[in-house]
Amino acid sequence: LNHSMAHKLGGEFHIPHGRANAVILPYVIAYNAQKPTKFTAFPKYETFIADKKYAKIAAFIGCGGHTTEESVQNLIKAVYRLEQELDCPTSIKECGVDEKLFFDRLPALAERAHEDQCTTANPRYPLISEIEEIYTQAYFAPYQGSQSVH
């Protein structure tokens, strides 16, 4: 999903692909770490494990927590800190995208991200409205922790 959203965001607003991926990443991790109501079309596992995989990554890079949820939040914060240390924008707005233009194009942007070939590889099958919400969160503010996208 992150890659799908970055494809469309970068193409629409001329944001370099790596930067678009970085800005969206904290929100997609938060989204994917929540138990889905629907898996992807062809999941590679029978039970939801994305949150546990994120927790393993957090432990591997030295920011694991006492619970899976705490580990996921620590991972998201570590991604955000890295963006700050590298002096990268931490929101779509900081990438120079005009707010009115962004929200005028948001519905079509989310629909195109939903249709992107990479979306089917995501551990959660997103609704277009969920993609819009992730984009909206990523537009306005740096990641604040414990945000959820339903």
Predicted regions: what they are:
Residues 1, 6-21, 115-121:
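Glycine-rich phosphate/pyrophosphate-binding beta-alpha loops
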Residues 1, 80-88, 108-114:
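Short acidic alpha-helix initiation/capping motifs at coil-to-helix transition points
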Residues 1-5, 70, 93-96, 122-129, ...:
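Short coil/turn segments at secondary-structure boundaries
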Residues 5, 9, 24-29, 134:
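Buried hydrophobic packing segments
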Residues 9, 61, 96, 135-138:
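A general structural motif at alpha-helix termini
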Residues 18-101, 144:
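Gly/Pro-rich interdomain helix-loop hinge
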Residues 101-150:
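Short, amphipathic C-terminal "tail helix"
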